[in-house]
Swiss-Prot record:
In the N-terminal section; belongs to the N-acetylglucosamine-1-phosphate uridyltransferase family. In the C-terminal section; belongs to the transferase hexapeptide repeat family. Catalyzes the last two sequential reactions in the de novo biosynthetic pathway for UDP-N-acetylglucosamine (UDP-GlcNAc). The C-terminal domain catalyzes the transfer of acetyl group from acetyl coenzyme A to glucosamine-1-phosphate (GlcN-1-P) to produce N-acetylglucosamine-1-phosphate (GlcNAc-1-P), which is converted into UDP-GlcNAc by the transfer of uridine 5-monophosphate (from uridine 5-triphosphate), a reaction catalyzed by the N-terminal domain. Pathway: Nucleotide-sugar biosynthesis; UDP-N-acetyl-alpha-D-glucosamine biosynthesis; N-acetyl-alpha-D-glucosamine 1-phosphate from alpha-D-glucosamine 6-phosphate (route II): step 2/2; Nucleotide-sugar biosynthesis; UDP-N-acetyl-alpha-D-glucosamine biosynthesis; UDP-N-acetyl-alpha-D-glucosamine from N-acetyl-alpha-D-glucosamine 1-phosphate: step 1/1; Bacterial outer membrane biogenesis; LPS lipid A biosynthesis. GO terms for molecular function: glucosamine-1-phosphate N-acetyltransferase activity; magnesium ion binding; UDP-N-acetylglucosamine diphosphorylase activity. Homotrimer. Keywords: Acyltransferase, Cell shape, Cell wall biogenesis/degradation, Cytoplasm, Magnesium, Metal-binding, Multifunctional enzyme, Nucleotidyltransferase, Peptidoglycan synthesis, Repeat, Transferase. It is an enzyme of class 2 (transferase). It is found in: Cytoplasm. GO terms for biological process: cell morphogenesis; cell wall organization; lipid A biosynthetic process; peptidoglycan biosynthetic process; regulation of cell shape; UDP-N-acetylglucosamine biosynthetic process. This is Bifunctional protein GlmU. The active site is at residue 366. Residues 1-233 are annotated as: Pyrophosphorylase. Residues 234-254 are annotated as: Linker.
Amino acid sequence: MAQAGSASPLFAVVLAAGKGTRMKSNRAKVLHTLCGVPMVNYVIGAIRPLVPERLLVVVGHQAEQVRAVLPEDAEPVLQPEQRGTGDAVRVALEAIPEEEGVLLVVNGDGPLISDRTLGELLERHRSAGVGATVLVAELPDPSGLGRVREDAGVVRITEERDATEAERRNRLCNLGLYAFELPELRRAIREISSGAGRGELYLTDVLEIIGRRSRAVTYRLKDLEEANLVNDRSQLARAEEILRRRILDAHMKEGVTVRDPVSTHIEASVEIGRDTVILPGTFLRGRTRIGSDCVIGPSTDLVDTVVEDGATVEHSVGRGARVGRGAAVGPYAYLRPGTVLEEGSKVGAFCEVKNTRVGARSKVPHLSYVGDAEIGEDANLGAGTITANYDGAKKHRTVIEDGAFTGINTNLIAPVTIGQGAYLGAGSVVNKDIPPGKLAVGAPARVIRDAPGARSSSGDRRRARTEG
């Protein structure tokens, strides 16, 4: 056993092999997300600052799916049969050849645990010079957790299903985090493996065995909020609420205004610049990045979307889109993947835009579908402009050049190009290219004369044009 205060090598194991039957889910418990992050990755993130020599994750149920979400510095170790936490640690020990060191064992269903608490547990273990240390807390509602008794260096943990009525009245609970001296743990694991005589092997049994040889102690959790383990959907919601509040607090401390934290949901991966205002009912998810001085919401849902400085997005949905500096979106717009709005552009009420670039200062103000299109600068699409981009077999592109203007209820049958400065009359159905500077009307559209202001400079036309 290591001497008190010595810094022996640290190894870490996350137990993530269980099914989580109380979740009543087809998905392994540790794969359930909180604020966009799989539960198990919060635990790994708390361990990482301790800089272990190796960080192992024991996988079993849906092993491939769990492996797929693990970060690169986490080493998966397969538990072929889920025979309890004791067997999971035995499997992990087989992957650690070192004889000396400290093994930190953490359950994968505690997403609120902090690196600070893990560091304090480790410090308590090393300074006490004991064989094992377990994290405990006295909880107002200990339902579902093992009860802990400590007596003269021996720690006994009784699972709730095995506890007597008197033991259940004990509110000192095991939180599933341990520090072990490797030699002591290896010996104790062999004893429960050979003598337990039951289907599952409980890691908690090793504490009493180690305590009889070299003492085991407890460390009491200081922040009870971290004791929120996840075993069912209610506990999942409670833990996510706490994480969501932490995320919002962090953004507000960095200069972001959140008008209603109760109705605002921001995932851990989202970035927001200072002096941006987030209005009620807003969801920001995935790789979304919001610049400075933006207004987002109310009732807006953005996923993997970039919003540059000074832009506004209200009552709208964005998926894999980019909103340029000072651009305006909404209300009730839908930006689909591949949409790029350049500086000062606008996509207004009841518009859907997909795989389209909208040039600087161009406007799609209302009631339009624009898909697979390239819109130049200073163009204006009248209400009800539709790009018919799909012929039943292939998607085709529409090009609307700088300064072009479409009247209301215009249909553009792709592939088609509307030339620079061209005008389309209301109700036009365009199935052929329209030359620059011409006015076309009708169904099918035909050129009848020069567009209004065709002989003026483009700047004059831009100043004269009003939004449809």
